């Protein structure tokens, strides 16, 4: 990996967080809420349910936080941290539109199809998509629902 440029050093994060740790805590919170509703401990099944329902959305939201420079997630490329603040991408109105598509869970192909249908400038779309690189944000869930490290969802 190449060293950080001067622009990247200026927004070097003070705190780095782990998607796996935060995801596990979110899954345990979900388990607690669902267990309270059911009246008994749903256990590992509830954690697996959270992973199936929410992991991808959770990762997408955290990826956007990483791009905006809000939170540095160690599983994402450190060079992408704050890229929206230090690049000229936000000067293009298309960038926010594309980011909104990503917030909805869409992928590059959906965005390219939308851009073609809407007659958007494809060269600019390609530059934005290449810079954002949504494909690098694919992080599999690695914590084991059968063996949570945390015993409670609080804190």
For each predicted feature, which ranges?
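Polar low-complexity intrinsically disordered regions
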Residues: 2-155
